[in-house]
Amino acid sequence: MEGDFSVCRNCKRHVVSANFTLHEAYCLRFLVLCPECEEPVPKETMEEHCKLEHQQVGCTMCQQSMQKSSLEFHKANECQERPVECKFCKLDMQLSKLELHESYCGSRTELCQGCGQFIMHRMLAQHRDVCRSEQAQLGKGERISAPEREIYCHYCNQMIPENKYFHHMGKCCPDSEFKKHFPVGNPEILPSSLPSQAAENQTSTMEKDVRPKTRSINRFPLHSESSSKKAPRSKNKTLDPLLMSEPKPRTSSPRGDKAAYDILRRCSQCGILLPLPILNQHQEKCRWLASSKGKQVRNFS
């Protein structure tokens, strides 16, 4: 087949050998190659061709300068400011801002009609496939294991699985707070669906422990002795500032103080029931501890 074609000396194109003589005569007389695009153009229209095809124009979207002949291709495929549809909200967005827009748009949630959960847009398509299969299994009567329950940790602001919550609190919560919420010998974790019952149980234990009436003053030396015996087990652990800052009980007090120690009020910060004579000083220490914990959480994050 190569022998049936010949190359024109003027336009550098392959021409059928049968028509080569006629083509070359016409091409040399009437056509000339454009110096910009190297395309054969009639001699009388060369000036018009250069103005129309090779004139420098600017893109209206990105203001980039280019030849007029390349403008349409640039707008459709190369321009970084061309409008592109967001795959989540189906709105047109500039290509240069599309990635940032989709990161925010994909984080929005939508209610799944199958399971009633709020799912992020970027995971919605995958979730619907899983949800349909689960609904199909439910329709067939197959048993689906319930999702693992999680409990919110107020110290690190994360959701922790229920079966790991106790061990997580041992690392995340200060020692004194951990012992207060989880007394030694009772490591069970109450279900998160019964917060009021857990609060009542903790309040009852707190009320028994932190009610220093004058007729039970002799209990404090026993408490210090028991704490001193447990001290060697945790030499590296720091003492709770709240426990260190509580005032020592008076050795002798008038009858009016006895009535004041019988009146219990709840701390506005931690909710512990305390007698009136020591409530104010405890609240000051409790606010200081809460502010220091907030700073530690912000520094960690």
From Swiss-Prot:
Induction: Up-regulated by IFNB1/IFN-beta in cell lines sensitive to the proapoptotic effects of IFNB1 but not in apoptosis-resistant cells. Up-regulated by TNF in trophoblast cells. It comes from the Eukaryota. Seems to function as a negative regulator of members of the IAP (inhibitor of apoptosis protein) family. Inhibits anti-caspase activity of BIRC4. Induces cleavage and inactivation of BIRC4 independent of caspase activation. Mediates TNF-alpha-induced apoptosis and is involved in apoptosis in trophoblast cells. May inhibit BIRC4 indirectly by activating the mitochondrial apoptosis pathway. After translocation to mitochondria, promotes translocation of BAX to mitochondria and cytochrome c release from mitochondria. A zinc finger (TRAF-type) spans 22-99. Widely expressed. Expression is frequently down-regulated in cancer cell lines. Isoform 5 is widely expressed. Expressed in placenta (at protein level). Residues 189-257 are annotated as: Disordered. PROSITE patterns: ZF_TRAF (PS50145). Disulfide bonds: none annotated. It is found in: Cytoplasm; Nucleus; Mitochondrion. The keyword Nucleus applies. The gene is XAF1. InterPro entries: Innate_Immune_Apopt_Reg, TRAFD1-XIAF1_Znf, XAF1_C, XAF1_C_sf, Znf_RING/FYVE/PHD, Znf_TRAF. PANTHER family: TRAF-TYPE ZINC FINGER PROTEIN-RELATED, XIAP-ASSOCIATED FACTOR 1. GO terms for cellular component: cytoplasm; cytosol; mitochondrion; nucleoplasm. Interacts with BIRC4; the interaction is not detected in. Interacts with BIRC1, BIRC2, BIRC3, BIRC7 and BIRC8. Part of an complex consisting of BIRC4, XAF1 and BIRC5; the complex formation requires IFN-beta stimulation. Interacts with RNF114, the interaction increases XAF1 stability and proapoptotic effects, and may regulate IFN signaling. GO terms for biological process: apoptotic process; negative regulation of type I interferon production; response to interferon-beta. One of its GO terms (molecular function) is zinc ion binding. Coiled coil: none annotated. This is XIAP-associated factor 1.
